[in-house]
Curated annotation (Swiss-Prot):
PANTHER family: 5'-NUCLEOTIDASE SURE, PHOSPHATASE, PUTATIVE (AFU_ORTHOLOGUE AFUA_4G01070)-RELATED. Keywords: Cytoplasm, Hydrolase, Metal-binding, Nucleotide-binding. GO terms for cellular component: cytoplasm. A divalent metal cation binds at D8, D9, S39, N87. Its main location: cytoplasm. Residues 234-257 are annotated as: Disordered. This is 5'-nucleotidase SurE. It comes from Natronomonas pharaonis (strain ATCC 35678 / DSM 2160 / CIP 103997 / JCM 8858 / NBRC 14720 / NCIMB 2260 / Gabara) (Halobacterium pharaonis). It is found in: Cytoplasm. Belongs to the SurE nucleotidase family. Its EC number is 3.1.3.5. Nucleotidase that shows phosphatase activity on nucleoside 5'-monophosphates.
């Protein structure tokens, strides 16, 4: 089993190291990851990127999508699967799928026809913000365990016959035992807002505040509900694709002059 490993927190982040070490137990792993933090850049692309040798593989002066394209298109890598992560912070809900650099790396791999897994860890809100939180390798143990299991078994089980990629979100390790795994779908809840102050606008994501309060009405079976309640969420997803049944649009096109 050959794995191309990337992330959006940067190749020296603790999360990618934790995942690299876990995956190395079951696969040959080559990291092709950003040289620095590229969080929340989505599928942003560069025209050219510089590569640097790194003990884990290659550091790329570019985005997560750049890394996947470089790895699959220029570095002669032929992985069985692409893994992105492990992200420092959850990537939950439909609205983050196009924003997250971690998830976007998995989507980029899907367009290459390569199965992919995006992996993130949910850090419950406490006295510090996610920006102030300083995780260590043990915080990624549950996520690493889940991803290693999926990498080792998902292809053989036919998981990617129906899904292009998996979005995996894991809680912090429980005090005893391991978190169970649940197949989920992304939550529909969306609570972005903007607050104007003179010539500036503050962009606010109220989801994180409500997660801390435990007041988000996520129904059973959704990714955020599972993770907040201490389960590993696995959402099987497809890359963007055409839809059908657009009679109304067809009628408009016929009348267009």
């Amino acid at each position: 089993m050959d794995v191309l490993l990337t992330n959006d927190d940067g190749i020296d982040a603790v999360g990618i190291r934790a995942l690299y070490d876990a995956l190395a137990e079951v696969a040959d792993v080559t990291a092709v990851a950003p040289a620095d933090d590229q969080s929340a850049v989505g599928r942003q692309l560069s025209r050219t990127v510089e590569l640097h040798d790194h003990e884990l593989g290659y550091a790329v002066e570019g985005t997560p999508a750049d890394c996947v394209i470089a790895g699959l298109g220029a570095l002669d890598l032929d992985p069985d699967i692409v893994v992105a992560g492990c992200n420092e912070g959850a990537n939950l809900g439909e609205y983050v799928l196009g924003r997250s650099g971690t998830v976007s790396a998995a989507v980029e791999a899907a367009f290459f026809g390569v199965p992919a897994i995006a992996a993130s860890v949910y850090f419950p809100a406490g006295d510090v913000t996610i920006e102030e939180f300083d995780p260590d390798k043990t915080d990624f143990a549950e996520a690493s365990r889940a991803v290693r299991y999926l990498v080792d078994n998902a292809i053989g089980a036919g998981v990617f016959d129906a899904a292009d990629y998996l979005n995996v979100n894991a809680p912090l390790p429980p005090e005893t035992g391991h978190a169970p795994m649940e197949i989920t779908e992304p939550s529909h809840v969306y609570e972005m807002d903007g607050e104007r102050d003179g010539e500036t606008v503050r962009i606010q994501d109220h989801i994180w505040e409500r997660m801390a309060e435990g007041t988000i009405p996520d129904p059973p079976g959704t990714d955020r509900r599972a993770v907040v309640e201490g389960r590993v969420s696995v959402s099987p997803l497809t890359a963007p694709h055409p839809t059908t049944g657009h009679e109304g649009l067809a009628g408009l096109a016929e009348k267009y002059q």
